[in-house]
Amino acid sequence: MSELAIRRGAAPALAVEGLGYSYPHAAHAALEDVSLEVAPGEFVLLAGRSASGKSTLLKAACGLVPHFHGGEIEGEVRVGALDAIATGPGELAAAVGYLAQDPETQVVSTTVAAEIELPLELRGDEPGDRARAVEEVALALAIPHLLERTVDTLSGGELQRVALAAALVTRPRLILLDEPTSQLDPVAGDELIWLLRRLNEEWGVAVLLAEHRLERCLAAADRVVAMEGGRISFDGAPADFLAWAQDADPALETPAARLFSLAGIEPLPVGVRDARQTLRRPGISHPPRQASRRVRDPRPTDPASTPVLSARGIWVELDRGEDLRDVLKGIDLTIGPGERVALMGRNGAGKSTLLRTAAGLHEPVAGKLEVGSVALLTQTPGDYLVRERVGDELPGDEGLAALRVVGLEHALDADPRDLSGGERQRLAVAIALAGRMEGDQLPGLVALDEPTRGMDRARKDDLVDLIARLAGQGALVADGSTNSTHDAAVVVATHDVEFAAAFAARVVLLGDGVVIADGPAEEILSGGWYFATEVARVLDLPGVVTPEQGAAALGETR
Amino acid sequence: MKSPFAYQPRPGPLQSASPGAAVAYLGAIVAVAFLYSSPVVLVAAGVAAILAGLLAGARRAVRVALKMGLALALLIVVVNALVVSRGETVLARLGGWPLLGQVDITFEAIVAGLSGGLRAAVAMVAAAVYSACVDPDRVLRLLRPLAGRSALTATLVSRMVPVAAADAARLRDASRLRGPGAAPVGKAPLARRLLAGSLDRAVDVAATLELRGYSLDATRARNRRARSRYDRRFYAVAGIVLVAAIAGKALGADDFQTYPEVEVGLGPATLALSALVALSGLAPLKRRATRRTTADGTKTALPNRKSSRWQEMAGRRGVARV
């Protein structure tokens, strides 16, 4: 009998029975007839598109629903021996920890040590017990070196770990996580998943993790629960989930599973290791490395074309609190018309600073920057929406032209708050574009900073279409004086390698303020560990990064 | 950008001291500023506050507070000079002004304003040093048993203010990035948006507090007595400064008069008190360890940078010094 089966015999860490819930004044129920059990020590992945009910289910399991949000609830939720509907989140805190998407709003103290200690202090624990618990959880999460730091000096990944430590310090038997890696770079995201697996294996903490990037965590999960329209649509093993998603909801397929299904290989793999093992089986021939195609350099070779951005040795220094720090260190970069460029690199590498400098928000302290009109969408599209009617945000012909470009001309009278997340983002793009266009032609450079945070696959696909459409529109070139038109270049700063592989022809990889790699997307995204797609990690073939390319490469050898 | 007054953990004595000791020490300097009007003593208190900040590593906080304090001092001098016409040394007669009536600028009013301005500047620098060097979490933990809800409100404010400042900066950037064809963003819509965002964040933070167990009716947690080996030093310096200030006041060390003529006393009591107050700024000085105790209990001298340099210099000159 497996250990998991033994654990399954014990009282479940979480038991949900016939749960239905509606937020106050909501037209539709957020959850309908949800029944679910999480065994002690089990790692369960919660999959589903945006607004499918994942977050609400997690909030019900930690008591925020209905105690904090109100609304109408029916059914039963038990966390260990506690009734989560009758008991408030405070009482449940000892039995369940909760980690949300945005680490910024999950810390309330000034220093890390005080933040982690707060739940114990509020519970009335003795000072000695608190000191030990803080030390233990800091060691478990590898953050003892952060204890004396102030929370405003931490990176997103560090802050997320601190929030996790505060959620775990009471030693709950269940931890709920709502897209905890959505704001992290691939390195920090993978580290967090690895950490969860270790907590799960070594300390027996049951994990219920809601996540969009399934390829990141499917291999770590014991079980997958998929949700759709507030109901559970699938509950089973990861391999069975992939077979189910193939027919029921292809947007939930992982890239490796899609590669296998396109190539007609069974069974579908739950992770890179699994996929490689399957490919080593007799009867399946893995293409040799040299069989890969030559990758064409996407940069324009026409010397007559005027670049839309030309940076030569630019340095940018920013005030980071105590001292000025060089964030960009002599960047050389040229982007031509019509290019689709992914700007990648870990948090703090200088991606956003480069885009903000191009848009005129920062002034280089050295070097030469030549750039025409730039429309930049920052990381929070909501910041652009300040009025209650789309038409009031974008008045006149210029506004209408911008709305047409993003396909929102029908929504003139809508309230931006009533639009979907994707539509709000497109509206923000239109606001950045308005007045920078020549008729229906876009400005020279359209820049998007981390546009896929918290997005599901379907919305990312929509964004890929939008980028392709933007890159196909005419634009004013850098020396606007010539008034000649070219295609617009689109530059997207992103951590999402799969998204980069889907839209970009070229990838520029930044590391600590310098360009460390610049080349065709297929080449850059197949030549590393972290900044490589799942298909690239499975096949390890230069130039093969998407499931379609992978299936073609496998097909050549079969 | 991080506020210059934000707390920054550093390994200095002032940061290591318990909040009570740090407050007593900086409070004593501020108390001198409010007890005395003599510019000599006020300058000494200012020197003490600046020294304390610099030795504690809060250079940026001191610099910014000094700039703000001196600007405020200048404002007080100007306002006092315009509003108060007392004093015998008239420097300028500016005639009749609406609301103010006859305005005569006198040397005495300027000096009186300078005294008030210096007092404000000292208080500002001391407050900046407190803010940059004293861990607010430890202060709030100290206050929590006395006023739990107020302490928590203060915690939230101290957390939400920098978050709101970051939100405001982001919204300003977004308004600058709007295309010229989009409706311009006035201050009112921006403020509304900032308020709405802050409320959303406040709701999220409130949810976090709920999850941390804020609503629990737990018995008040006992706190460790936050002790430091520097506490006695700061309490002692605070005590000495306060006792000397009170005694000096009784002995006429605050010998300063502005009207009808300026008279600044420079008697021994004033000078001694000023020297003592200025020297109190050295309290956060970290003493270098000069001896190391080995495992067997023997004590050996530690090489320090100064003596090494001396030895190096002595060696170059061909003189052996130990």
Where are these regions (language model features)?
Chain A
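ABC ATPase NBD Q-loop/coupling interface
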Residues: S22, V65, E76-E91, H362-K368, ...
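Conserved ABC ATPase "signature" region
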Residues: G128-L146, L309, I314, P395, ...
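ABC ATPase C-loop
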Residues: A167-L168, L433, M437-D440
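ABC ATPase nucleotide-binding domains
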Residues: A243-P303, P307, F531-R558
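Helix-to-loop junction immediately C-terminal to a conserved catalytic motif
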Residues: C62, A359
